[in-house]
């Protein structure tokens, strides 16, 4: 569902030449490059994607990342930077392409709530894809041990992680919006909306970023709270301004999915040696009713997670 760009000569900017410029954009990287920024076209979307590279530690070659479109506004860039998505001298705002986290808590199960224990969620925002490895106790008291997956336009269940697939095509529309219910997933939507993202204010002064990704058509609104009183989060000291997503709504298929985020942690308290931060209390709703109440016990950004689409999910025989 995402755009695929060939890294042609015209689209790839040599990392050495780019990073030799004075300054840059992105936290801790100095001032912006000299010269006027490129203009946003009337369409509200960047004309094409451009990429820059940086050298890996230990001489492991170059890694390329997508430079933020000139159509992506100041508020979106600042929030992306606050949670670790905005990086580098030539700013990229998609530095988090996936997450893996484990939770305890509750999740809707028929007419009741299942109790979750060490449930793992894997999300790849660039595909998009998600795997929910649900463990715990169902609302009826029976053991819960299910693996629910979607990737691209397909949905299926697994007997084991990556194995024993059975089709679950009729669940796709219920699974896709869940990927928006994390700070990173929500921000991917308003980033992809580029110049079409609308910035507004709530009555109590919070910022709301509303945009629809052209790749899935889901309207997402991210409520952002500016804070100078918080624990140390990544590189942000406790009295330093940080802009945190605290709530999200995602409208899809005639329903409204919601999420609230609290108790952010980062650095050694959540994921060692990185700047990404993540809420440890997450609550989801569906049409205003409780859907999940999650306490995060483990988190990793950009983990190695894969979502090979099985033949059965595509309606084909594996023989």
Predicted feature locations:
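Disordered, low-complexity segments in secreted/periplasmic proteins that are enriched in proline
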Residues: 20-38, 45, 57, 163
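Flexible, processing/modification-adjacent segments and terminal tails
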Residues: 35-38, 67-78, 151-240, 250-255, ...
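N-terminal mature ectodomain segment of secretory-pathway/periplasmic proteins
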Residues: 42-162, 192-205, 213-215
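Short amphipathic beta-strand/extended segments with alternating polar/hydrophobic composition
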Residues: 115-120, 143-152, 163-174, 221-225, ...
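Bacterial N-terminal signal peptides
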Residues: 6-16
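Gly/Pro-enriched, hydrophobic low-complexity segments
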Residues: 37, 203-315
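Positively charged n-region of N-terminal signal peptides that target proteins for export
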Residues: 1-4
